[in-house]
A protein has these predicted regions:
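Accessory carbohydrate-recognition regions in carbohydrate-active enzymes
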Residues: 27-376, 380-424, 430-487, 495-521, ...
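ATP-dependent phospho-/nucleotidyl transfer catalytic cores
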Residues: 492
Length: 757
């Protein structure tokens, strides 16, 4: 009997040990904890690590001092290799290739205030160490040893709260230095309200991409409220300090508030912004952070981030791969940004205050030339409601500004890239299920701005539209980027056609599908490349495949693959599959990071080459794409230098996400994916229809890049293309991977992704 009891005991114990984690065992971290906001803050990427809610208007992030008009640290405000912080900004733009935002800078300090911060980014800088710095979604903390103060921040959509733990008995202060926006300011005001322990103000700034702050300016307003009374206060006007002065205005202003000795008595600061008024900023703050509960706010935003990040989860892979993946998803939940206040008001492209429709949000900050290729698909997949509002927001911008914006920041069109990328962005989101917007009005606006030259708020629009319609291409002697602009416009036309088709406008669909084939007009049979062409019909000469004349951020060989809607025609024009395969072999024999517009190789660091890794699927050699995509994935990692180029508001990160799940949206405006095989054992996606799509992979590790078989809901899949409508209702997509190519799978006569004529 005793032996029987002992036997039963050991059986029960062994079962418990098999199902309960050992205290020392390593457990997979949550999707929230896997995010590392420092990824992409190094040499390339241009990301920032600060505290922000999903798509939040406000982002509290550190800014590094820089002494040039533009350097690598000035773009997002932060560069991981820098050792000093000169303040915390309230607005930032992630991944962009030019310096932007970093508005309404402030810094907690101690000691004397004997230097003016006006126009001096070094005046109150402090050293910092990454050993005493933490960043998680919605949270940022860092110690500033020069002032013996520990800072931490967390954020809601329009507001944020910070806590400053002073460890010195010296007088504690908070310095406001708005002239340290990325491009300075054109005007501004600061007001100190001692009775309510509040500082308010506004600045006018702008000048994206090396421009003056007076060029295409926007206004941003703020309110900052403290939980400690002011022992002193004052302002600066230029280099002159004015103690006990409460108000200051101009383009050379700063202010301070003091708290006396606050050693071991933390000071809290609540802040909010608005693009409408100080009063609206105050309403935003009162609505979102009514008390001083830092931990409560942090818990709320953590829950919100967890909700978004749980919409696409992965299992398997290495810890570094999971961190890279979830951070890439995180990067695609930062922009575009909520632009309306809690009362629904927002500043329109006509510089008038408008009211967003109940239940909707107005969004701003669209890096469309970058994001239409990848982020548009991912955001519509993860956040269809928000994506619908983004489409409606762009329509509002067009109605108020006269035409769709192409590359906008806040309520200003900067137009820094070629093409008219609003259209493929909208068409991609629609194709992926973001459909709660005014389709007919959007279609009508697209037709309007693509047949008559109209500007958005006085800028950009469909550049060279008359020439494009007359010649069927953009002459390089009329615009220096004529070749790449023509290719982009073909993608734009194809995207407009898809919206026209969805809206039931068949004649317009046919018209734009015809225009979408204009790439043929710049194809040079001699070089078998898309070559810049002049008004007289002659091709640009001299010409080489790596010359950049006629192309925006690239060259002829890099743009050769830029007809995603009709790759069959490109293959035919160039002489057939064998020639294109040999060209692609040479092109992808090296992968370039960083800046490489004059190189003959696959430039992973910039958007026009994103889709070229998947072209083998059109050539009947899908195993070559499968291996190449794994090489692409290996160019990313979970370090600050982990991105191979500018993240461009999430575009680069979205390339990683789709490559890692083995499904890439290769055709702008079409809902579907070309297939390359997942990196992870299991991927789970919550679709916009409330269903769950599960992707599984046997033998998924990096050493097994090749697809052996694919089944969806237990039925064989033999094509390298899967339409989204087959997946969006959920199901199980099973892959079997291997370390040797299967030269039969995906090679059938109908196995390639579609081309549209």
């Amino acid at each position: 009997m005793l032996r029987m009891l002992r036997t039963k005991f050991y059986i029960i114990l062994s079962v418990l040990m098999s199902v309960l984690p050992l205290s020392g065992a390593s457990q997979p971290v949550s999707s929230y904890d896997a995010v590392n906001p420092f990824i992409g803050t190094g040499n390339e990427g241009n990301c920032y690590p600060g505290a922000q809610a999903p798509f939040g208007m406000i982002s509290i992030s550190p800014n590094n001092p820089f002494d040039k008009k533009e350097d690598v640290a000035s773009r997002p405000g932060y560069k991981y290799s820098r050792t000093e912080i000169n303040g915390f900004g309230m607005t930032h733009f992630s991944g962009v290739g030019c310096h932007a935002m970093q508005d309404l800078q402030f810094l907690p300090v101690t000691g004397s205030l004997d230097r003016t911060p006006v126009g001096d980014r070094f005046a109150y800088r402090s050293k910092f160490s990454h050993e005493h710095e933490t960043a998680k979604p919605g949270y940022y903390a860092v110690s500033l040893p020069d002032y013996q103060v520990d800072t931490k921040f967390t954020a809601m959509p329009h507001s944020a709260i910070g806590e400053f733990a002073f460890k010195s008995a010296d007088d504690a202060h908070c310095v406001f230095m708005p002239t340290n926006s990325a491009n300075g300011i054109g005007a501004g005001e600061l007001h100190i309200e001692t009775s309510s322990m509040t500082v308010t103000g506004w600045v006018s700034t702008g000048g994206f991409c090396w421009r003056d702050p007076h060029d295409r300016p926007y206004r941003v307003y703020f309110v900052a409220k403290f939980n400690a009374r002011f022992s002193d206060y004052g302002t600066w006007k230029g280099r002159e300090k004015f103690p006990r002065q409460s108000n200051v205005a101009g383009d050379d202003i700063a202010a301070f508030v003091s708290f006396g000795n606050r050693k071991d008595r933390p000071v809290k600061m609540k802040m909010a912004i608005s693009y409408v008024s100080i009063d609206n900023a105050r309403q935003n703050l009162n609505a979102e952070i009514s008390c001083w509960d830092f931990d409560g706010v942090h818990s709320t935003v953590q829950d919100e981030w967890t909700d978004y990040l749980s919409r696409m989860t992965v299992e398997g892979g290495t810890e570094a791969e999971r961190k890279t993946f979830y951070t890439a998803v995180y990067h695609n939940l930062l922009h575009p940004n909520i632009y309306n206040d809690v009362n629904g008001a927002y500043m329109g492209f006509d510089d008038k205050v408008h009211q967003v429709e109940p239940g909707r949000k107005q969004y701003a900050n669209f890096s469309l030339w970058d994001t239409y290729r990848t982020s548009s698909f991912l955001q519509a997949l993860l956040a269809p409601k928000e994506s619908s509002d983004m489409i409606q927001s762009l329509l509002h911008d067009a109605e108020q500004g006269g035409a769709y914006p192409n590359w906008s920041m806040n309520n200003v069109e900067y137009g820094v890239m070629n093409g008219y990328s609003t259209f493929p962005f909208i068409a991609a989101m629609y194709a992926m299920g973001a459909r709660d917007f005014d389709l007919q009005a959007s279609k009508d606006m697209m037709k309007k701005v693509s047949t008559s030259y109209l500007k958005c708020k006085g800028y950009q629009g469909w550049v060279c539209l008359d020439d494009y319609m007359r010649y069927g291409y953009v002459p390089v002697d009329k615009h220096g980027h004529g070749a790449s602009m023509t290719l982009e416009y073909c993608i734009d036309d194809f995207s407009i056609a898809q919206i026209c088709k969805a809206a039931g406008d068949s004649s317009a669909y046919s018209y734009y599908m015809d225009r979408a084939q204009n790439f043929e007009n710049i194809f040079d049979k001699e070089t078998r490349l898309f070559r810049p062409r002049k008004q007289d019909g002659s091709f640009l000469s001299p010409f080489t495949e790596t010359g950049t004349d006629g192309y925006n951020e690239g060259n002829a060989i890099q743009y050769f693959w830029s007809v995603p809607h009709n790759m069959d025609a490109v293959i035919s024009l160039a002489g057939g599959r064998k020639f294109v395969e040999d060209r692609l072999d040479a092109f992808t024999s090296k992968i370039n990071r960083g800046w490489a517009p004059d190189q003959p190789y696959y430039w992973l660091g910039n958007e026009p080459c994103f889709g070229s890794a998947f072209v083998y699927n059109y050539l009947g050699k899908p195993w070559k794409s499968q291996l190449l995509v794994r090489k692409v994935l290996s160019s990313f990692n979970d370090t600050p230098d982990g991105l191979p180029g500018d993240d461009d508001a999430g575009a680069m990160s979205a390339l990683y996400v789709f490559s890692a799940i083995g499904l890439y949206p290769c055709i702008p405006g079409i809902g579907g994916f070309t297939v390359t095989g997942p990196l992870f054992d299991r991927v789970q996606i919550k679709t916009g229809k409330g269903k769950v799509l599960v992707i599984t992979a046997q033998n998924a590790p990096t050493v097994n890049p090749y697809i052996q078989s694919v089944r969806f809901n237990k039925k064989d899949v033999t094509s390298t293309w899967i339409p989204w409508h087959q997946l969006e209702n959920g199901g199980v997509l099973d892959f079997v991977m291997g370390n040797m190519p299967d030269r039969h799978w995906g090679t059938g006569s109908n196995a390639a992704p579609p081309s549209f004529y």
